[in-house]
Regions:
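Alpha/beta-hydrolase fold catalytic core
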Residues: 1-23, 44-47, 84-85
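Active-site loop/oxyanion-hole signature of alpha/beta-hydrolase fold enzymes
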Residues: 14, 38-44, 50-90, 94
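Active-site glycine-rich loops that stabilize anionic/oxyanionic intermediates
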Residues: 20, 28-32, 93
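Structural cue for short, hydrophobic secondary-structure segments
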Residues: 25-28, 51
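Alpha/beta-hydrolase active-site loop signature
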Residues: 30, 54-58, 120
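Flexible "cap/lid" loop of the alpha/beta hydrolase fold
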Residues: 100-105, 109-150
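Conserved alpha/beta-hydrolase catalytic His-Asp/Glu region
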Residues: 142-166
Length: 166
């Protein structure tokens, strides 16, 4: 019986390749699966590469909460929804922490774990990111906007400052 995760949301994804082992690539904070397209193209002959957008990122649905536990459950539900039993898992930055959570909680689903640009510790710069997120929330913009819509809504000078800080 497949477990049900009430907080999990369906993830938008891109897929490259039709043969070889399944490799799931999890992007970092403020990114999307699109960030890994050139990497996917470079190994497409050897793997089936799945690149989901995390909740509140890319084209995946937005949710009120975003914990590593929830993001790990999103990944496992993604695996279930796509008939993927045991996979290779690569995570970058935030995706690396999510990948570690998947491997820790669901070891039977992960044959290989690759973590890029992250360690299993709390980083002080997280507070800086949290301040940026709170500042963006205080701008009063609608919750569901694409990056293009945000760029049109804010003065160009402010946009340069925001993306420079990220």
């Amino acid at each position: 019986m497949t477990p049900t995760y009430l907080e999990a949301i369906p993830l938008n994804y891109r897929k490259y390749g039709d043969t070889g082992p399944d490799l799931i690539v999890l992007h970092g904070l403020f990114g999307s699966g699109k960030n890994w397209r050139s990497f996917a193209r470079s190994i497409v002959n050897d793997f089936q590469i799945w690149m989901p957008d995390a909740r509140n990122h890319g084209e995946s649905p937005h949710a009120e909460t975003m914990s590593y536990k929830e993001m790990a459950e999103d990944v496992v539900c993604f695996l279930d929804n796509n008939g993927l039993e045991r996979i290779m898992l690569l995570g970058h930055s935030m995706g690396g922490k999510t990948a570690m959570q998947v491997a820790l909680r669901f070891p039977e689903r992960v044959s290989c774990l690759i973590v890029v640009d992250i360690a299993p510790v709390q980083y002080e710069h997280f507070q800086k990111n949290l301040k940026l997120i709170r500042a963006m929330q205080e701008l009063g913009l609608p919750k569901k906007m694409t990056r293009a819509e945000v760029e049109k809504s804010l003065p160009r000078r402010l946009m340069k400052s925001i993306f420079f800080l990220l």
